[in-house]
């Protein structure tokens, strides 16, 4: 029996786009500040989970909601289980969008919206692949279970809770990365660097009142703001002129304001996914490189000097001795993404590090402590820690997925590792598969995120063919 998978997708294009639009319109940024006992990760992620499960109920699948933090859509009765793993939460948005990030806009063949590429678009594509198999009543020998999490972009609380109470597949894929395949994922963790408060620190021409930047540990910060107390009014004009010259010659835009004995410096860079920080413009580290040339108070000078010297343009963690390289999994990446400094309070920087096999989290911690031993800091590992994950290229899952990719695209398939962390790493034999195609711009976690419409439909056909081959 020959199935024209692309034809089946084309027959469902309008339905797919409508469902995707309905899901995108839900602002599903994790929001524990407004969480409740019934919706612990916030109302948005819970609403998005319920919406996608509604699609499953409407289409005749078995569904299950686990405490509004995770759930699944299931089809088939086989003893073996094949897993699909997606997420309905999205990363925060900033003010640099050209359109409403939660109102899908189709322009020039692209669907612009937060979550269009990561991960609502690919998840809906994989869901429709599953639906096509059901609609065609194709014979299958395995149960297909599509598991949805609601805080993949942060601490994975939802999926961990799911794993505590539900049976997990041993094999499957997550539609949350790129083609041809991601069969290796680096270890991921964050290091919080806390600066000691120096008593009786000397004042400078300017005192650093605050330095703030960043939305999430896994996002390169798109804007940063420093507030300086002016101790020498004669220095302000030179500061302003130098700042204007600085933003003219660098990759950041800037704003300068003066009021009530203080100046406020704002830099605007470019947000990006922390797995590839080189594609962003880190507004905070750029701002630090400007401020480092000025005489600041003792606490402020120590903070700014450390950021400028050890964290600016250090995409691979070499300055902090966090670097290693693996033949298959590639190089370490490092990105300083959260900055929280107040003169009378905390003074912290959080770095997101993604490392291959060959170095451990404790090795990195010890190396960073040695490098920064004279900076008066303490360093701690915070949040969720993910270890490196690799499924060999010889695995039948990897071989089948690459075969399907090659047949649908005419392109050569090959194994690949990334610094991103997907739910694929949860499974013993789990990988990430699509939905971004080679040569496409990676706009995940960035303003004006988009998914090419044709790629969305092509990915759906690939998913349907691949899933069916693996469960028939």
Per-region residue spans from a language model:
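Active-site metal-coordination/substrate-binding segment of hydrolases
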Residues: 58, 81-148, 152-154, 447, ...
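Active-site-adjacent substrate-binding region
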Residues: 223, 237-253, 388-426, 430
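A short beta-alpha structural unit
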Residues: 272, 306-313, 340, 350-357, ...
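N-terminal helical capping/dimerization or prosegment-like subdomains
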Residues: 1-83, 91-93, 350, 455
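Acidic/histidine-rich catalytic neighborhood of metal-dependent amide-processing enzymes
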Residues: 119-120, 124-198, 240, 315-328
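Phosphate-handling active-site elements
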Residues: 107-108, 130-145, 238, 296-302, ...
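Acidic-enriched catalytic cores of C-N bond-cleaving enzymes acting on peptides and small amides
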Residues: 184-186, 190-270, 274-333, 360-376
């Amino acid at each position: 029996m020959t199935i024209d998978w692309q034809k089946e997708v084309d027959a469902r294009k309008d339905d797919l786009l409508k469902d995707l639009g309905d899901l995108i319109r839900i602002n599903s940024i994790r929001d524990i500040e407004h969480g409740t006992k019934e919706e612990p990760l916030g109302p948005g992620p819970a609403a998005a989970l319920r919406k996608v499960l509604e699609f499953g109920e409407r289409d005749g699948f078995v569904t299950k909601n686990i405490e509004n933090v995770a759930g699944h859509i299931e089809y088939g009765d086989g003893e073996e289980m094949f897993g699909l793993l997606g997420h309905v939460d999205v990363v925060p948005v900033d003010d640099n969008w050209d359109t409403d990030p939660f109102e899908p806009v189709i322009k020039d063949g692209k669907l612009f919206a937060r979550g269009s590429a990561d991960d609502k678009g690919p998840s809906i594509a994989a869901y429709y692949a599953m639906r096509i198999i059901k609609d065609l009543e194709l014979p299958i020998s395995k149960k297909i279970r599509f598991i949805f999490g609601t805080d993949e972009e942060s601490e994975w609380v939802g999926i961990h809770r799911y794993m505590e109470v539900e049976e997990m597949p041993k094999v499957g894929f997550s539609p949350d990365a790129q083609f041809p395949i991601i069969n290796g994922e680096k270890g991921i963790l964050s290091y919080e660097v806390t600066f000691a408060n120096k008593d009786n620190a000397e004042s400078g021409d300017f005192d650093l009142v605050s330095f703030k930047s960043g939305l999430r540990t896994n996002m390169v910060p798109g804007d940063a703001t420093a507030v300086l107390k002016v101790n020498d009014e004669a220095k302000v004009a030179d500061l302003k002129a130098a700042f204007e010259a600085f933003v003219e010659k660098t990759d950041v835009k800037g704003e300068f304001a003066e009021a009530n004995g203080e100046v406020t410096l704002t830099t605007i860079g470019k947000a990006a996914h922390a797995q590839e920080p080189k594609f962003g413009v880190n507004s905070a580290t750029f701002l630090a490189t400007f401020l480092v040339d000025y005489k600041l108070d003792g606490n402020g000078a120590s903070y700014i000097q450390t950021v400028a010297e050890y964290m600016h343009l250090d995409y691979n963690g070499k300055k902090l001795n966090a670097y290693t390289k693996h033949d298959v999994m590639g190089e370490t990446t490092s990105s300083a993404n959260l900055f929280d400094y107040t003169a009378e309070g905390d003074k912290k920087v959080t770095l997101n590090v993604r490392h291959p096999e060959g170095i451990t989290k404790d090795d990195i911690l010890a190396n960073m402590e040695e490098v920064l031993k004279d900076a008066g800091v303490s360093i701690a590992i915070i949040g969720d820690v993910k270890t490196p994950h690799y499924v060999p290229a010889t695995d039948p899952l990897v071989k089948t997925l690459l075969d399907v990719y090659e047949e649908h695209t005419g392109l050569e398939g090959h194994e690949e590792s990334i610094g991103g962390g997907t739910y694929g790493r949860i499974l013993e034999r789990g990988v990430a598969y699509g939905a971004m195609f080679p040569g496409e711009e990676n706009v995940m976690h960035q303003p004006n995120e988009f998914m090419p419409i044709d790629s969305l439909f092509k990915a759906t056909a690939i998913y349907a063919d691949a899933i069916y081959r693996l469960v028939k």
